[in-house]
């Protein structure tokens, strides 16, 4: 960028509005694919900030982080660099729901992400609050910031998080903010409405922070980092972290709930003067929500989590609230271990604008303005991981379109990111959307352990994954298949030695010869247990893990692949984007209206639109078949 004239410094290939988790992945993807990127943000010192819990991952979300990594994104690597406590969740529940969750040093995470943006030669990170989207003949042209500066770009990606007309609530006190301590974007919503976007209002919240020295950890349950070496990124060597930053578990009690009920009338959500209109997240309710909706529960869990190495603040996971400050102090100090808590930052709720994601294509490009993309919380989602997953897809697709190449659309059967985006653009949102394992029909195929096997080919195709890594994935795939075939051919015959081992492992002895493949199907037996009988076992733990899962769950996996084949039949049945739905006979009025609005790209997507019934689909297929003849 050295030596650029001022006018050149206002012209870019891609402009990213916002530098949160979605904006980071979008900017890095487009820049690494060779395009000049401008990132405009309210505060360049809070890039990739974690305004709520200082953690990355969890059920479904942790798999998304691995998928981002497999596509060539940054979240997994930076989490590995900055995590202070990490655990594998749901180990006893099987591979379909296993996921990593890490406590991050939130200050270090933000600084690391800022450095990665600033050191990329194709990225300029700059302060600016975007107030208007510039368009020309139905195509995006650029943006205007709060200084009145016009920036021109061939593509614009909006990743504004909670900043669109953001408003904070603490009891009956309310003030404009994008998040605590930062200005909101007050004018951009008006520009989006002028362009035809439908805008709604959601709310979320965050708990108070308390000072470490005021916490009595001795009466809480300690939760240390894992003893097993772990890593989010496929590029990083798994490691065991020092046990310097444990999390702690305590609980609310009847006194806590009594205090909450006493102050409900001052709540902006439940009070006599209801100030909050936006709908909050179902799966991350405030403590007052939990007390009101679950009256029979005498206690709720509170996880006391460190915010980082260079701060003494702790996060009270489970005590999100918008009650008045006085009520917060009393409530917190009623909890075991927090009797003398010093609150450093109050809890608050925040209300913000989002756009209806049904106005987007599965590429995350807007249907209303060409080359205008949206990603993250502005699309009605909640969570850092969901935002980052959308961000990398928006960045990749903006770059692919500028290259003149086909877009990247992940299927529901390929990735949790595919499930997330398909749900958004097909069904829309009436509450903040959180990704859950239950939302994925094919979750046994979308595992934590196989994200690179599923998605590295796409990362390599678009230029975000290096050749050596892709070849490593192909080699791994080959070795897995070879080992499965070998196990089918190696026969074990009944003998005293064999049966003694099987009996000691609490499984039935052999009466006739069987293959190692058949033996490994037994739930009591692992690959390592059978090594004593195997003349030529392998030692690669990554291959062993995949072999075990594929052998033990073969029936379920095969059934899912059969379901995917049916699913893809309808996914591959394309619907012309300009189809005149008024010409399709016998559609219900509701179906016709929704098909016009969403304009599904395939019969498969049309089938997932709420309110579209089987007879509507049949009539649509009949009409399309006749048009083809």
UniProtKB/Swiss-Prot annotation:
Binding sites annotated in the UniProt record for NAD(+): 280-294
Xref: SMART domains: GIDA_assoc_3
InterPro entries for the chain: FAD/NAD-bd_sf, GIDA_C_N, MnmG, MnmG-rel, MnmG-rel_CS, MnmG_C, MnmG_C_subdom, MnmG_C_subdom_sf
Localization annotation: Cytoplasm
Keyword entries, A-Z: Cytoplasm, FAD, Flavoprotein, NAD, tRNA processing
One GO-annotated biological process of the protein: tRNA wobble uridine modification
GO cellular component: cytosol
Cofactor(s) of this protein: FAD
Main location: cytoplasm
Record NCBIfam families: mnmG_gidA (TIGR00136)
Similarity comment: family membership: Belongs to the MnmG family.
Cited HAMAP family: MnmG_GidA
Quaternary context: Homodimer. Heterotetramer of two MnmE and two MnmG subunits.
Function: NAD-binding protein involved in the addition of a carboxymethylaminomethyl (cmnm) group at the wobble position (U34) of certain tRNAs, forming tRNA-cmnm(5)s(2)U34.
Protein name: tRNA uridine 5-carboxymethylaminomethyl modification enzyme MnmG
Gene source species: Thermotoga maritima (strain ATCC 43589 / DSM 3109 / JCM 10099 / NBRC 100826 / MSB8)
